[in-house]
Amino acid sequence: MFVFKNKQSSFKLGTITFGGNPGEFPTILIGGLFFKGQDVVENTRKGTFNEVLTKEWINTAESMSERTGHPLILQIYGRTEDAIENHISWISENFEGPFIFESINPKTRVRGLEYCQESGLFNRAIFNSINISSTDAEKEAIQNSSLETAISLGWSPKATSLEERMQTIKDIVETTDTLGVKNIIADPGTMPVGAGYGLELRTLLAMKSELGLPSCIAPHNAPSAWSFIKQNDFNQESLHTASVVASTVAAQLFTADCIMFGSLVRSEEVFTAVALIGNAISAAIAEAYHTLDIDRDLFEPKTFQ
């Protein structure tokens, strides 16, 4: 199990602690909502969705979080400015914890920032993400807002080695800091299987070892384009879930503090797997600390039986 020499920074958002040493705090799980193709989605442009089914998904995830001790964060996607506003508004009224908001559209991300500012939600909202493609308008909106927490996505198509990936991360973290963001979560970026998947796991260790920042990762992206699980003679949904679970616990073992596991509908499978590995990490770290004579509080899994 991994024990880092450098200090590991942490911060709190509500009742949830981000960062810290491996095993010190429970792994945070981030479930996605309102992405195209999800059963809850009705109209991506207008931001309409099945509120009853969405609430069922949230209730299930909250129950699993309570039973395992692993915190839950919601990842909200919005295709348009109207959609991101509708989604954030509804989630802020129907979920008490922190949430991430994002879009592939820069104008939509800016509207998300503006809405959170207008609604006083920056004590809960996390911006995803500041990266090499961030526009000047986004950066200006961030500087003019009360945004406290953001993800720094350290990915570049030119960064194909650990050294290059780390330099990209350092550059983006520096940019995030200059924009006035207090709480920075570093994300090395996840590539699909066959297109670089795996380097981000090595990069996670380097990030924690060298920078000591809270980390997050979206390993569910790895099997997203994996042709192996899309063969006609396979139960594709079953294999997709298995792949998401496997990629999630791999990231957990490689010291990710927060893990985006894709669709919230997979909460039961993902939380159960992470709880199991959480027990393994707890026992391994306790033994390592005893051997190294380190006195530090550790997360005690609720599922230790």
For the regions a protein language model found, what residue spans apply to each?
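Alpha-helix-loop-beta-strand connector modules within alpha/beta enzyme cores
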Residues: I84-I100, I104-K107, R111-F122, R202-A222, ...
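Generic structural signal for short, flexible, solvent-exposed coil/loop and linker residues
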Residues: K5-K7, T17-G19, I88, T175, ...
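Active-site beta->alpha loop and helix N-cap motifs at the rims of alpha/beta catalytic domains
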Residues: S9-E164
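N-terminal start-of-chain detector that recognizes signal peptides
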Residues: M1-N6, L72, F99, N123, ...
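Catalytic alpha/beta core domains of metabolic enzymes, predominantly
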Residues: I142-A286
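Extended, intrinsically disordered, low-complexity segments
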Residues: F2-G19, G31, K36, S263-Q305
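A signal for specific C-terminal beta-sheet/loop modules enriched in small/flexible residues
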Residues: D39-L53, D177, G278-H290
